Amino acid sequence: MNEQKVNVDFGGRTITIATGKMAKQASGAVMVSCGETMVLVTAVALKSAKEGQDFFPLTVNYQEKAYAGGKIPGGFFKREGRPTENETLTCRFIDRPIRPLFPENFLNDTQIMATVVSADQDNDPGILAMIGASAALEVSDIPFFGPIAGVKVGRVDGKFICNPTAEQLAASDLEVVVAASRDAVIMVEGGAAEISEADLLEAIFFGHASVQPIIDAQIELRKQAGVPKREIAPPAVDEALGAKVKELAYAQMKDAVRIRSKQERHNRISAIADETVAALEADFSGRGAEIKDFLDGFEYELVREHILKDGERIDGRDTKTIRPITSEVGILPRVHGSALFTRGETQALVAATLGTSSDEQRIDSLYGESRKRFMLHYNFPPFSVGETSFRLAPGRREIGHGYLAERALERVLPKHDDFPYTIRIVSDILESNGSSSMASVCGGALSMMDAGVPISAPVAGIAMGLIKEGDDIAILSDILGDEDHLGDMDFKVAGTSTGVTAIQMDIKITGVTREIMGKALEQAKEGRLHILGKMAEALAAPRTDLSPYAPRITTIWVKTDKIRDVIGAGGKNVRGITEATGVSIDIEDTGKINIASTNKEACDKAIKMIRDLTAEAEEGKLYMGTVRKVMDFGAFVEIFPGTDGLVHISELDTERVKDVTDILKEGDKVLVKCIGIDKQGKIKLSRKEALGAVLPE
């Protein structure tokens, strides 16, 4: 097949989607280009599902090749290794909008691989990879209810921007990724600087409108180069078995789904399943999986019906009520800041740690090295849901949840010049029954306030849900885990009392209109304000003092030409200061020096040593110096470390001096006065004019 391509204008730039030239043995393959950024995306699905497969095994991989940016990987092996955090997050951005668009009964192993093969500084390869995933599926024989496309939305000076550059993003008050189909928004994720719900809604639908040309281009490419889709047989449903399961278990399931305790409810539903399978073993041997599928369908139907018709949820709440909330701070005595945030059966233990610039995370990417001073790490141990598992590194879900909570909090952080600390937050989920990432936001804000971080405002998060059957709609505040699983939308919103700082939305159905989203955002705001009020009962504002175990950072400035004097040859001077005082010192090219220590006296001593190294003599001032060298014509006196001045023999005493050694010897301490500095910077000192004077403290 010859190469086929389509070009489309996208936010003032041209995107090209091409197929038929590379990776032709994949089910579908496209090269998506914009500027000098190029991403190869392939889609492959096995010809049949594995025997006994009961879920859709979709895998998405995204990799940024070092050569794409003209770099050679670091490390001993000099090749790409485990995925970076950015690669993991991009995998999730690609996975989430396409996963709901495969047929329910398509269970073949499917893999999407996106490889960045060329990268410039202006065009986001992650967005191109998302577009490429949809396009590769469109031209393949894999059944897929697409196409979809993604866009990053920013706003500068009140104007929305499609796929902003790095420079524009730096000035933008929001950064939101929107994935959408022709008719619907499917996924939203991003952060914002406390913007209003109305502005956020505008941004989402600006994104939806922006992707339409990309969707048109994919449809055109499919016409040019697509192959027929595979025929997928509709799932066989045994009506007789279904009727028998309903007869035995439907009434029991109706009672079970109203049990309010998560563990008791799950245990009861599991027991009903076991009893039903056992009861039907004689007539329907080996059909346990099908029986459980029917029971899952009953649960789905009963929970949704109860909410829509009766307005009552699984745990007895109405649609707007938030679960009981308790917050405690300062519960870990040696930790710089800590909080225990509990909402219903979801609980997060959150710790904040303050560090110096040496603790910043260094990130090596295609675009060079960057540093990160704020980190939030989210951990989801198996005991939080009463399970066991073998845990090594954090999974994609943990990285994604941590990133969302991090974005929610980073907009309220103080400026680095005002609070020069590196901040690490760790959220350990101790119990989980819905919205644990939003519990991490609440606990994260409280832990920072407990640590004395002067955040501009407290932040709270809430997870919203949606049940929709035809025109019947229920928007749910503070959803449970089961409501997330059985509902049509998972909508997480975090923010302050003023506005939204982060959002994550995944929609599983079509027909979620702008009006529904607007209502969900307003209902989320009501819930967020309620949660903020509950948090304020534990701690309303940041503490004014840091923990005694946190480092105190003092900032001083020196002239840039004095930086080398502070560092010394081979780092001798700065190393000597740290060894003598035990402090941590960070020196910036601007002349800014941060001194960190838990001991104030050590910090003061280090500051004095730095001041001595960088001090400059001033005419008319007195100095206590040390005689370093005696000559026939006078003595050289060190008034600062490394800074000498000459006391001429005529300036030693009021009387005539025949021999310098009659007055001074090497190593003597002597009070001198600066009487002049010549054009070459040579310092003239006088002992004579300092006689009888007292050095001010």
From Swiss-Prot:
Residues 551-610 form the KH domain. It comes from the Bacteria. Keywords: Cytoplasm, Magnesium, Metal-binding, Nucleotidyltransferase, RNA-binding, Transferase. It is found in: Cytoplasm. It is an enzyme of class 2 (transferase). Involved in mRNA degradation. Catalyzes the phosphorolysis of single-stranded polyribonucleotides processively in the 3'- to 5'-direction. PANTHER family: POLYRIBONUCLEOTIDE NUCLEOTIDYLTRANSFERASE, POLYRIBONUCLEOTIDE NUCLEOTIDYLTRANSFERASE 1, MITOCHONDRIAL. This is Polyribonucleotide nucleotidyltransferase.
